[in-house]
Every structure is written in C-alpha cells, then in structure tokens.
Amino acid sequence: MSVDAQTVRRIAHLARIAVSDAEVPPLQDELNAILAFVEQLGAVDVSGVEPMTSVTPMAMKQRDDAVTDGGYAREIVFNAPLSEDNYFLVPKVVE
C-alpha cells in the first residue's frame, strides 16, 4: 500500500492538522515508511508462538473479581447536609 499526496491531505484534514504544501512530501515519505514496516511485521511467521501479554513472566496471580456494594454507603453520606436512604439530597436547580 502506498500513500499519495491526496491521502496525506485527507488524513491531515480528518485529524484537523494544518499541513502546508511543503510539508506534504516529507509526511508522505514517513507514512509510506511506517506502512512498509507494518507490512514487514505482517510477513513474519509467528505460527507456533504462544500469544503473551507481557515480555516478563507474571509474578503475581490474578484474583477473581468479587462484586460487592462496597459497604461504605453510610460513611459516604455521613457528612452530607441532607441524605435519605443512603442517597444525597440536593435542592432542585432546574424548573
């Protein structure tokens, strides 16, 4: 895949970046180099390589999530000027 000058201008427009005519050719070259590198990465044979999330082994095991209500509702609304059933009460501000 190759990026032309029109594509560079379109990308700049979509990104809301002001690009002068003098800046288009260098940007075009940079984008083409990036795409060439990505194509190189796509050509690498990774069959047999196990997917990983980190290059270093995990020292800590992940724990299962436990969903709770937190148990802090009373402490949270304790200092509120007005509260009811563990909810903050605020004056009506919109008619």
Curated annotation (Swiss-Prot):
Pfam families: GatC (PF02686). Its EC number is 6.3.5.-. One of its GO terms (biological process) is translation. InterPro entries: Asp/Glu-ADT_sf_sub_c (IPR036113), GatC (IPR003837). One of its GO terms (molecular function) is asparaginyl-tRNA synthase (glutamine-hydrolyzing) activity. Keywords: ATP-binding, Ligase, Nucleotide-binding, Protein biosynthesis. It is an enzyme of class 6 (ligase). The keyword Repeat does not apply. SUPFAM superfamilies: Glu-tRNAGln amidotransferase C subunit (SSF141000). It catalyses: L-glutamyl-tRNA(Gln) + L-glutamine + ATP + H2O = L-glutaminyl-tRNA(Gln) + L-glutamate + ADP + phosphate + H(+); L-aspartyl-tRNA(Asn) + L-glutamine + ATP + H2O = L-asparaginyl-tRNA(Asn) + L-glutamate + ADP + phosphate + 2 H(+). Allows the formation of correctly charged Asn-tRNA(Asn) or Gln-tRNA(Gln) through the transamidation of misacylated Asp-tRNA(Asn) or Glu-tRNA(Gln) in organisms which lack either or both of asparaginyl-tRNA or glutaminyl-tRNA synthetases. The reaction takes place in the presence of glutamine and ATP through an activated phospho-Asp-tRNA(Asn) or phospho-Glu-tRNA(Gln). Belongs to the GatC family. HAMAP family: GatC. Heterotrimer of A, B and C subunits. This is Aspartyl/glutamyl-tRNA(Asn/Gln) amidotransferase subunit C. It comes from Methylobacterium sp. (strain 4-46).
